[in-house]
Amino acid sequence: MDERIKKFIHSQKLLNLSMLDEDGGVYCASCYYAFDDKNLALIFASEEHTKHIQLAYKSPKVAVNIALDTDVINLIKGVQIKALFQKATKEQERIYYKKFPFAKLAQACIFALNIQWAKYTDNKILLSKK
């Protein structure tokens, strides 16, 4: 993965996770995440009973969007990702709790989204070429 993409993913903390719903539609959830750059995985916490986790178990191929929140057009950055949902490894749990130590107080499970494909957009790069 390009280092610019890794740097951007590390700089953010909130992702939007999308998966197929029971009726063939799309369901979305926002999650705080940590990045396992060695294994190219996004790590997040949630509870087993939540709708997005139940849907991801049924259809583990998911989509992710991470975007910089800005109104300045040349500062727009983001990454679109196709990922595979699974339970996090013990090492990934450590990565997550290092970034969000307060999450240890919750009784949530830790999950990983293994990145299969990523597309990065950075308007600063795009607009500088015009």
Question: Language model features by range: what are they?
Answer:
Residues 9, 55-56, 96:
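A generic structural signal for nonpolar/aromatic side chains embedded in well-ordered alpha-helices
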Residues 48-52, 70-71, 127-128:
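Short, surface-exposed beta-strand-loop junctions and turns on beta-sheet-rich folds
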Residues 1-3, 49-52, 94-96:
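Charged, amphipathic alpha-helical segments
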Residues 73-130:
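Charged, gly/pro-rich active-site loop segments
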